[in-house]
Swiss-Prot record:
InterPro entries: Ribosomal_Su5_D2-typ_SF, Ribsml_uS5_D2-typ_fold_subgr, RNase_P
Cellular component, GO annotation: ribonuclease P complex
PANTHER family: RIBONUCLEASE P PROTEIN COMPONENT
UniProt superkingdom: Bacteria
Family note: Belongs to the RnpA family.
E.C. number: 3.1.26.5
Keywords: Endonuclease, Hydrolase, Nuclease, RNA-binding, tRNA processing
Function field: RNaseP catalyzes the removal of the 5'-leader sequence from pre-tRNA to produce the mature 5'-terminus. It can also cleave other RNA substrates such as 4.5S RNA. The protein component plays an auxiliary but essential role in vivo by binding to the 5'-leader sequence and broadening the substrate specificity of the ribozyme.
GO molecular function, one term: tRNA binding
Catalytic activity reported: Endonucleolytic cleavage of RNA, removing 5'-extranucleotides from tRNA precursor
EC class (word): hydrolase
Protein name per its UniProtKB record: Ribonuclease P protein component
Subunit structure: Consists of a catalytic RNA component (M1 or rnpB) and a protein subunit.
Length: 140
């Protein structure tokens, strides 16, 4: 595969895979996007992108957002090993904020880059189970 490939192994493809990541609390929110990250063991990093028509009516906009996500994921993939990353569009881009395609692309890229920087940070470990402490007056 080429240097810029986005192989199937690097994608979240099945409903169960998406659901397992969605079940977690969002790691970070930006003005327009939500980031979810889940540890996936020693497997390579995988990306899922959810861009609904409710928030991006035109296919051109949805495709531009997906391309930006895939490119930023590709650049940071070595830092994301062992994680499933899911990006979801959560709000519309008001027309007055993005008068041109270049402005739309710039805003998307800036927000997504910030989210991917958060995704590369170490994941917080789940709290370790502590053994129950004996109470005063109880016999072990």
């Amino acid at each position: 595969m080429g240097l810029h490939a986005y192989p199937k192994a690097a994608r979240l493809t099945k409903t169960d895979e998406f659901s397992s990541v969605f079940a977690l609390r969002p790691v970070r929110r930006s003005r327009h996007f939500v980031l979810y990250v889940r540890a996936n063991g020693d497997r390579p990093a995988r990306l899922g992108v959810v861009i609904g028509k409710k928030f991006a009516k035109r296919a051109v906009e949805r495709n531009l957002i997906k391309r930006q996500c895939r490119e930023l994921f590709r650049l940071r993939q070595p830092l994301l090993g062992g994680r499933d990353v899911l990006i979801r569009l959560q709000a519309k881009f008001p027309r007055q904020d993005v008068p041109t395609v270049a402005a739309f692309k710039r805003i998307c890229r800036e927000e997504l880059a910030q989210l991917f920087e958060v995704a590369t940070r170490p994941l917080s470990a789940p709290p370790a189970a502590t053994p129950p402490q004996p109470t005063a007056g109880s016999t072990p």
